[in-house]
Amino acid sequence: WDKMRGVLMPERRRRSITLEAGGHGYQNFLNASSDGGALFGAHPEWFGMDEQGERRREPRYVICTSQSRAVEYLIDSVKGYLRAHPEIDTFAFWPPDGAKWCRCEACRALGSDSEKHVRLVNRVAEALREEFPHLRVECLAYEVYLDPARKNVLSPAVMVDFCPIDQCFETQVDDAANPKNRMYATAFRQWRDCFDGQINLYSYY
């Protein structure tokens, strides 16, 4: 977006286009290169731990979400980005594609990856609400996050992109009679039963 911003902003205003920015980008707001590369050395405990107990620098490892100061740092980084881009209407706050979540003892106690994902999204959405009242935060129901979390209920102020990445297009995505779509039909019904916010169908063609 930043590369094309100068060209596209006038067209956006002319056409009253709603702008969504973000994506698979937790790692853009806190990573081993932050603070000139000094952050990992200063706070290794903020970074995701692998199954062997090692803190990892790689961007696909999600931060240690049980570390409140790490989450606060990430939120401050998100706020800085949004202040510099006031034109954004919807902020897609998604984990890295193929994310590896922290396996420290405290993070394991938080539950599944889906539970940790929803917990973090709720925290970020709440932190942004006062300063950015016009903004919609969006998250994914996708792959390991396809089914709704149960322990952490997603805030209805957040939009959900329901992403049936492997659906069969020969029938409707919610057709439980289609073996390929059955899990999506089940998951979509669960989302509708437990979530009062907006659900978008993010389809792949």
Describe the residue ranges of each PLM region.
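Aromatic-lined carbohydrate-binding surfaces of glycoside hydrolases
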Residues: 1-205
